[in-house]
């Protein structure tokens, strides 16, 4: 919204704005609105160095099933985006048979219950005395990420996962539980993607590691 106000006031002449803010200029003849395709993606990045996920990483597939990505695209991006199931930019060379976690709330609950989670009286799953509860951190100043995180938390609570979105000016990477990541691989995926998900790579804030 701040950029929109700056554009309207003449303080700035060019800016990248959200799809919602872009609506303020589509009928204004003094502005030209360009739709730009990007390789950006957004997703929940788990901190696998955190003890909670070391104990409960088997709940992550259920979390993926519980999130309606298309609803996020439609409501937050006003349809200006596509559903993503991985970090690589979609193109004609993609393998369309990759593992996908399409929106399926019933499947989410099934995965949890098979793994030994039981639904508590408060509507939240628990196991061994521990609630399935975690916080998704969002960097301050990005309304799109904040909105995506809020919708994800709402959808997760509908299946019995107590997720909370927290907007912060500074992120404690080592001690956080999860983060609403924003990244992209517009060119060489070996460079842009492995630095985030490769074992011991400099930008691998999640501690993710897969020998395969």
Predicted features and spans:
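Extracellular/periplasmic solute-recognition and catalytic clefts
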Residues: 1-50, 167, 178, 182
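Short, hydrophobic alpha-helical packing/hinge segments within bilobed ligand-binding/sensory domains
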Residues: 3-4, 21-22, 59-60, 72, ...
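Loop/turn elements at helix/coil->beta-strand transitions in domains of secreted/extracellular proteins
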Residues: 11-13, 29-31, 55-60, 68-72, ...
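Solvent-exposed coil/turn segments that connect beta secondary-structure elements
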Residues: 20, 38-39, 49-51, 68, ...
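Short, solvent-exposed loop/turn segments at the edges of secondary structure
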Residues: 28, 34-58, 83, 129, ...
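Append "and occasionally in soluble cytosolic enzymes with long acidic Gly/Pro-rich linkers
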Residues: 55-154
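Extracytoplasmic/peripheral linker and loop segments enriched in polar/acidic and small residues
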Residues: 73, 164-171, 192-212
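Long, His/Glu/Asp-enriched segments that create or flank divalent metal/ion-associated functional microenvironments
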Residues: 147-168
């Amino acid at each position: 919204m701040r950029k929109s106000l700056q554009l309207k006031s003449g303080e700035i002449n060019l800016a990248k704005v959200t799809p919602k803010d872009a609506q303020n200029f589509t009928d204004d003849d003094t502005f030209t609105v360009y739709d730009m395709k990007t390789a950006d993606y957004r997703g929940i990045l788990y901190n696998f160095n955190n003890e909670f996920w070391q104990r409960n990483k088997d709940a992550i597939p259920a979390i993926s099933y519980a999130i309606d990505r298309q609803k996020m695209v439609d409501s937050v991006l006003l349809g200006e985006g596509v559903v993503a199931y991985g970090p690589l930019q979609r193109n004609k060379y993609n393998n369309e048979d990759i593992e996908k976690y399409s929106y399926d709330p019933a499947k989410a609950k099934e995965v949890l219950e098979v793994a030994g989670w039981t639904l508590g009286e408060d509507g939240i799953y628990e196991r061994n005395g521990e609630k399935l509860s975690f916080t998704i951190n969002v960097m301050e100043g990005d309304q799109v990420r904040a909105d995506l995180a809020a919708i994800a938390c709402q959808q997760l609570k509908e299946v019995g996962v107590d997720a909370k979105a927290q907007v912060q000016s500074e992120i404690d990477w080592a001690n956080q539980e999860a983060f609403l990541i924003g990244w992209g691989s517009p060119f060489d995926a070996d460079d842009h993607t492995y630095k985030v998900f490769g074992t011991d790579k400099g930008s691998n804030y999640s501690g993710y590691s897969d020998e395969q």
